[in-house]
Amino acid sequence: MDQAKLARLQQSVRIGTGKGTPRRKTKKVHKSSGTDDKKLQTSLKKLNVQPIQAIEEVNMFKEDGNVIHFAAPKVQASVPSNTFAIYGNGEEKELTELVPGILNQLGPDSLASLRKLAESYQNMQKKEGEAKKEGEEDDEDIPDLVGETFESKVE
């Protein structure tokens, strides 16, 4: 094999310009330290919190209309100090995802946001209906072939 051709191939394959190859950067996964959780537990013990059993779900309503939903959370409460601690994986969901089972939990503010949501949904339906009507107008340019085949129409 030609030495010049071999040298060109080796040069094109070489990755780094300096000695060796560059170091690869790896993502380090930081484990959540248990010290924060322990500090939180000790401060809650000072408040004399008691666990509350049989809570199926917790929903926190945000001002933008979304809901933070906790399914089967662990809840601890201290009524004299007006402190509630909720543990679990919270998911941010839209109000529409939780509507059937959440209606009895809605307060006056949330009902107003639900009305706004319903109005915006109706407006979207109207806009989609108008878009479909406009789409039907485009179909008028295409001739209808009722009872005939395409070949007979062309001939």
UniProtKB/Swiss-Prot annotation:
Residues annotated as domain NAC-A/B: 34-99
InterPro entries per the UniProt record, alphabetical: BTF3 (IPR039370), NAC_A/B_dom_sf (IPR038187), Nas_poly-pep-assoc_cplx_dom (IPR002715)
Cited SMART domains: NAC
Presence of the UniProt keyword Ribonucleoprotein in the record: no
Location of region: Disordered: 1-39, 122-155
Swiss-Prot/TrEMBL keywords: Cytoplasm, Nucleus, Protein transport, Repressor, Transcription, Transcription regulation, Transport
GO CC entries: cytoplasm; nucleus
Cross-referenced PROSITE patterns: NAC_AB
GO BP field: protein transport
Localization, UniProt: Cytoplasm; Nucleus
Gene3D superfamilies assigned to the protein according to its UniProt record, in alphabetical order: Nascent polypeptide-associated complex domain
Compositional bias annotation for Basic and acidic residues: 125-135
Pfam families (UniProt xref): NAC
Ranges in a coiled coil: none
Compositionally biased tracts (Basic residues): 21-31
Assembly and oligomerization: Part of the nascent polypeptide-associated complex (NAC), consisting of EGD2 and EGD1. NAC associates with ribosomes via EGD1.
Function: Component of the nascent polypeptide-associated complex (NAC), a dynamic component of the ribosomal exit tunnel, protecting the emerging polypeptides from interaction with other cytoplasmic proteins to ensure appropriate nascent protein targeting. The NAC complex also promotes mitochondrial protein import by enhancing productive ribosome interactions with the outer mitochondrial membrane and blocks the inappropriate interaction of ribosomes translating non-secretory nascent polypeptides with translocation sites in the membrane of the endoplasmic reticulum.
PANTHER family per record: TRANSCRIPTION FACTOR BTF3 FAMILY MEMBER (PTHR10351)
Family to which this protein belongs: Belongs to the NAC-beta family.
Designated name of the protein: Nascent polypeptide-associated complex subunit beta
Organism annotation: Coccidioides immitis (strain RS) (Valley fever fungus)
Lineage: Eukaryota, Fungi, Dikarya, Ascomycota, Pezizomycotina
Gene from which this protein is expressed: EGD1
